Amino acid sequence: MMIKLIVNADDFGLTEGTNYGIIDGHINGLVNSTTMMMNMPGTEHAVRLAKEYNLLGVGVHLVLTAGEPLLKDVPSLVGENGSFHKQSVVREGNINPEEVEREWTAQIEKFLSYGLTPTHLDSHHHVHGLPILHDVLERLAAKYNVPIRRCEEDRAVHPFSDVFYSDFYADGVTEDYFVKLKERVQGEQTVEIMVHPAYIDPELVKRSSYVMDRVKELRILTESELPEGIELVKF
C-alpha cells in the first residue's frame, strides 16, 4: 500500500530568489512539482530554469491577486492603479468571470508560448476555489486537458489528488511534518502538499508578507526523508 505524494512549490517566477529556492528544493529535497506565475519579475528566469531542470513538473499558478494582469481590458479585476485587487476584494465576488477567463487564458497561453507543457493548474491565494469561478475552471481544464488542484469544496474540478494539504505554512512548518504524514493519510491515496520554499531577495520582501518561513520550509524540505510507504509521484 503506497501513498503517492506530490510536493508542489507555489510561486515559481515570483522572484529569482524564490526560483532558486524551488530548484534547490527539487534537486536536494522533496519538491517534485511547481507552478509558475506568469506576471512576475522572475517569470522569464523561471522559464529558463524549467527548461534546464526538466524533471521538475511545472504547471501554471493562475494569478488574480498579485501584480498586474497581462490584459489591459479587465476593469473588474483591477484597482485604480492598474494592479490586481487584493485577495479580500476578490473574495467578495465582485469580479467578472468572463474577464477572469480571458486573463487566465492569456496566462496559460503565455506559458505555452515558451514551449512548456503544463502539468496542471492551481492559483495564487487559492482563488480558483471561489464558486463564481467554477465554470471558468471547468472550461480551462477541458480546453487545455489539464487537472486542477483540489479545492476544499465538494465541486472540485478535475482534481489530481485525493487529498490536498495547505498546512505546511507559517506555524505549520515543523521538523516532523513529513514523518507524521502517514498518520494522516488513509491507504493508497494520492496526496498533494503545497509548499513555498525560497531564498530571500529584496524583491520577495517587497512583494510578499510571507518571507522568513520560506527559508525554513526550504531547509525542512531538503533535510526531510519520507517514511516507508510514501513515494513521490509526478502528474
UniProtKB/Swiss-Prot annotation:
Instruction: Tell me if Magnesium is a UniProt keyword of this record.
Output: yes
Keywords for the protein's UniProt record, in alphabetical order: Carbohydrate metabolism, Hydrolase, Magnesium, Metal-binding
The record's family statement is: Belongs to the YdjC deacetylase family.
Q: What is this protein called?
A: Carbohydrate deacetylase
GO BP of this protein: polysaccharide catabolic process
Give the EC number: 3.5.1.-
Which Pfam families does this chain map to? YdjC
Cofactors required: Mg(2+)
Looking up CDD domains in the UniProt record yields:
YdjC_EF3048_like (cd10803)
Annotated function: Probably catalyzes the deacetylation of acetylated carbohydrates an important step in the degradation of oligosaccharides.
Question: InterPro entries in the record, alphabetically?
Answer: COD_ChbG_bac, Glyco_hydro/deAcase_b/a-brl, YdjC-like
**What GO terms are given for molecular function?**
deacetylase activity; hydrolase activity, acting on carbon-nitrogen (but not peptide) bonds, in linear amides; metal ion binding
Residues at which Mg(2+) binds: 61, 124
Signal peptide bounds: none
Record bears the keyword Metal-binding: yes
Species name: Bacillus cereus (strain ATCC 14579 / DSM 31 / CCUG 7414 / JCM 2152 / NBRC 15305 / NCIMB 9373 / NCTC 2599 / NRRL B-3711)
